[in-house]
């Protein structure tokens, strides 16, 4: 009986130790603002660019920018990509927001975004993710067309 108790105690200790060292598995967070448009509850009006990164083509020319936007009122983040010139047929631009804590990700085509930028357009934005500290997020932008892919990633905020 004493041996059985000792073995059970060791197994329990091992399980607790593994979770303490490795951490519990990450779970997707769910917040009221996740997936909503930046214009929901007027979040965009308090939005500012916290991080940005230029999209640079093979000729080393800046052709656009991807921004990580943050609303100080709503405590949310979203991504926006803006190209220097209006897109022509066959080209598109899309942005993506990713929350680091759980990997929740949206792009301009997600519900709450305004759709990827296509011919005749210059920009698009993603839905929001709740981003109050200790959460952080980053933005990714991609411009693509026939035989062309240019992308950029911001730092996290």
UniProtKB/Swiss-Prot annotation:
InterPro entries the UniProt entry points to: DUF2690
A Pfam family the protein falls into: DUF2690
UniProt KW keywords: Signal
Name recorded for this polypeptide: Uncharacterized protein YjfA
Residues in the signal sequence: 1-28
